[in-house]
Amino acid sequence: MSPQFKRLEQIYLTLFTILLALAIASCSGQDFGFLQPTPKDLCKCLPIEPDIADYRHLAKHVPIPNIVAQEVSVEIILTWSQDPVIPPDAPRTGREQEVFHIANAYLQNASVNALDCDVSMEISHTADKTAPRMIAETPVDSEYCAARQNLQAQLKQHGFVLDSQHGGELPQALPVDVVGMAFEDFEHDRGHVATLWELHPAIVTLH
């Protein structure tokens, strides 16, 4: 093996390790809230990780198109078939280009990923804490600023603090309305979450 090839191999392994570490960290990004200069203002959250470390970044950061939303439920989404592997730069295809509306779901968990600044939420079909869940995420993009602030204010009325340093499991599930685009994420530790399918981007509103 030539020295040049060996060096390239080392660089590749180093980059792969860094990207893997960032991907793992992004699943528990709230731990990095102390890095945010204005943690309480969800519209001033500054993404720390590079776009390249964010799985399917360009596919996720899009506006929700102004088309008729299809009515669906968490229960139905949990039955959708999942692809074994999707490339990290894959564009949206098929179902991912459609908008869906969940009229009745329950918000179980809400937090801000302080690395990419997305608001990540776990929702279920029933209020039961053991019910299987799916993810809904509101991106950092400026067009979602009002939606993020609205959710933050609504949760505050229920005594729950949501910002870059606070969030997590809600003491009691709250009924919500969700509208967003279907998105298939990659496999990672998801706890109660039972599918790779998400609504991302999504706007979540408490009833």
Residue ranges and their predicted role:
Residues 9-19:
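Sec-dependent N-terminal signal peptides
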Residues 29-207:
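OB-fold and OB-like single-stranded nucleic-acid-recognition modules
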Residues 1-8:
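N-terminal secretory signal peptides that target proteins for export/translocation
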Residues 6, 17, 33-35:
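Compositionally biased, low-structure terminal segments
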